[in-house]
Swiss-Prot record:
Keyword hit for Cell membrane: yes
PANTHER family, A to Z: CAVEOLIN, CAVEOLIN-2
Protein name (record): Caveolin-2
Metal-binding recorded as keyword: no
Source organism of this protein record: Aotus nancymaae
Record key words, sorted: Cell membrane, Cytoplasm, Golgi apparatus, Membrane, Nucleus, Phosphoprotein
Gene Ontology molecular-function annotations: D1 dopamine receptor binding; protein heterodimerization activity; protein homodimerization activity; protein kinase binding; protein-macromolecule adaptor activity; scaffold protein binding
GO BP: basement membrane organization; caveola assembly; endoplasmic reticulum organization; endothelial cell proliferation; insulin receptor signaling pathway; mitochondrion organization; negative regulation of endothelial cell proliferation; negative regulation of skeletal muscle cell proliferation
PTM sites of type Phosphotyrosine: Y19, Y27
Record-level GO cellular component terms: acrosomal membrane; caveola; caveolar macromolecular signaling complex; focal adhesion; Golgi membrane; nucleus; perinuclear region of cytoplasm; plasma membrane raft
InterPro entries, per database record: Caveolin, Caveolin_CS
């Protein structure tokens, strides 16, 4: 039971221009379909999603299924993951991208035209408020606390034992 431990990468390249209905099958140029070096996740936002079959399903050394079962389940896992991702992105990617665009545009508009002017206005008014607050504190709160402190400082306790 020779278990294959190497991962293989299989790619299918199809080119509508290279396939002629009259002259037979011609092979597509793989360089035409090769990724142009463009990383779709340059900031590694979804690095946690890079899972393989061994990360999800693992058999300990003491319990192994038949090699053919392991190989077939590995193939079905990879195919179903690939097909379901493509299927879901066909139906969900465009509507969700549209909704995310609307959400981010709304939040950007609110931030630019409402939140930041409000914050800047508050920061402009704060020195005046700080001066008024200091005057109120000096005129009302400080004398009140001083008088309460003097009242409590004259209190004395005497303990007697009967």
């Amino acid at each position: 039971m020779g278990l294959e431990t190497e991962k293989t990468d299989v790619q299918l390249f199809m080119d509508d221009d290279s396939y002629s209905h009259h002259s037979g099958l011609e092979y597509a140029d793989p360089e035409k379909f090769a990724d142009s070096g463009q990383d779709r996740d340059p900031h590694q936002l979804n690095s946690h999603l890079k899972l393989g079959f061994e990360d999800v399903i693992a058999e300990p050394v003491t319990t192994h299924s038949f090699d053919k079962v392991w190989i077939c389940s590995h193939a079905l896992f990879e195919i179903s993951k690939y097909v379901m991702y493509k299927f879901l992105t066909v139906f969900l990617a465009i509507p969700l991208a549209f909704l995310a665009g609307i959400l981010f545009a709304t939040l950007s508009c609110l931030h630019i035209w409402i939140i930041m002017p409000f914050v800047k206005t508050c920061l402009m008014v704060l020195p005046s408020v700080q001066t008024i607050w200091k005057s109120v504190t000096d005129a009302i709160v400080a004398p009140l606390c001083t008088s309460i402190g003097r009242s409590f400082s004259s209190v004395s306790l005497q303990l007697s034992q009967d």
